[in-house]
Amino acid sequence: MFITRRLEFDAGHRIPHHKSQCRHLHGHRYALEVTLSGEVIQTEGASEQGMVMDFSDVKDVALQKIANVWDHAFLVYRGDTQVLEFLNSIPGHKTVVMDSVPTAENLALEAFKVLDAAYIDVYGNHLRLERVRLYETPNNWADAVRNQISES
């Protein structure tokens, strides 16, 4: 069985060497969809009986590990030194330094890597993360899917 929980957050970024307007500082209303697989819990009387995982628990993990960390932050590539220096000069600015350019593809992959370790098989029902879908806009998104990600 597969279940999916959607969360939204706002963040700024730029794609430093992009040929178009994405090279400028800008922001998005991102949406993050987390898809998990597992067996439906059959334990009689368990709070999660009939579920793969309680949707509120799926949400809490994604909020703690990704959405709250990235929300109202500027996601900046470590190699984008001009912008990084500028952001570091602003006292108290919420900046998240990324090891890769913060494209939708790289953000989806980063979210997958972080969340994969967080959704552990706590119920004994073979729970695991299958996909992270990150919407940059309502019409543009990237998927990080378990069977397409190398174990690096």
Feature map (PLM): residue ranges:
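Charge-rich, low-complexity N-terminal segments
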Residues: M1-S152
